């Protein structure tokens, strides 16, 4: 009985904390250039809207997409998502630093990154339901029961993902996502926070990985979506399709990155490359012992970044939880 009370109280507390603390990606930095992210609360009142490389979304509460909506378009790039009109320029093999404005410690879970080719339509006009996403990096449990989200918080709410070196040049949508597991002990308890950016990739590579429609990335009942965070887990099965491209990696960003310049993004040109759809598959990740920062339990086809130090520099000048209320009833987290 005491175990039941403990689990239900914990679930209620973290749900209440989540109402206040949900976050969004405030910027990405590529090759020393910083691109502004979408602030959904502010963007709802902008007229005209800012022209960004970040996709527009209507999650003004910084809220989430729940598993019951995995078959809906909202899971692709968040609720009510609309195409970004600009693109961030990146070279294959280059790191993208992703900066969240905040992330609650209670919302533990994996960090997963995908790409999808925009094809001949170009990313500013592509139908989001036609995008086929392939996983380029994933991180689940790290050491000592910690999750990738803990590493992200420890790195100042930042994350790094490397664009695969073998990928074909073209225009892509980057889908960066944290899945919060604090209420995932039962079906429909996980919380998905997808964030999308347009990329213009320069590359000599030729790889065109098969992909999966955003509405087919996950199922509500699969392992890793249903997961008991409070039962002292020692491993975590990362959900979603398996990776089928090498040369990508991800991990917590260095504690003192170089000072970026500010970019508005380029107009998104057309691209003729389009991946072929494949069925999703579960990806599990074993526990590793004492990894370096951001290097835990990853299946990413490449080495993860190593923490480095750099001289202190001035901060860059940038250009630029009621909603979907968190469940206030306590979930029965018992198996």
Swiss-Prot record:
Cofactor info, note text: Binds 1 copper ion per subunit.
Gene name of the record: LPMO9A
Biotechnological and industrial applications of this entry: Lignocellulose is the most abundant polymeric composite on Earth and is a recalcitrant but promising renewable substrate for industrial biotechnology applications. Together with cellobiose dehydrogenases (CDHs) an enzymatic system capable of oxidative cellulose cleavage is formed, which increases the efficiency of cellulases and put LPMOs at focus of biofuel research.
Signal peptide residues on this chain, from the entry's feature table: 1-21
Function: Lytic polysaccharide monooxygenase (LPMO) that depolymerizes crystalline and amorphous polysaccharides via the oxidation of scissile alpha- or beta-(1-4)-glycosidic bonds, yielding C1 or C4 oxidation products. Catalysis by LPMOs requires the reduction of the active-site copper from Cu(II) to Cu(I) by a reducing agent and H(2)O(2) or O(2) as a cosubstrate. Is capable of cleaving cellulose, but not chitin. Is also active on tamarind xyloglucan and longer xyloglucan oligosaccharides.
Homology family: Belongs to the polysaccharide monooxygenase AA9 family.
Protein known as: AA9 family lytic polysaccharide monooxygenase A
Main location: secreted
GO MF term set: metal ion binding; monooxygenase activity
Catalytic activity: [(1->4)-beta-D-glucosyl]n+m + reduced acceptor + O2 = 4-dehydro-beta-D-glucosyl-[(1->4)-beta-D-glucosyl]n-1 + [(1->4)-beta-D-glucosyl]m + acceptor + H2O
GO biological process, one term: cellulose catabolic process
Binding site for O2: 182, 191
Organism of derivation: Gibberella zeae (strain ATCC MYA-4620 / CBS 123657 / FGSC 9075 / NRRL 31084 / PH-1)
Feature: compositional bias, Basic residues: 321-335
S-S bridge residues: 77-196
Annotated stretches, region: Disordered: 241-335
GO CC annotation: extracellular region
Sites where the protein binds Cu(2+): 22, 107, 193
Record's compositionally biased regions (Low complexity): 251-303
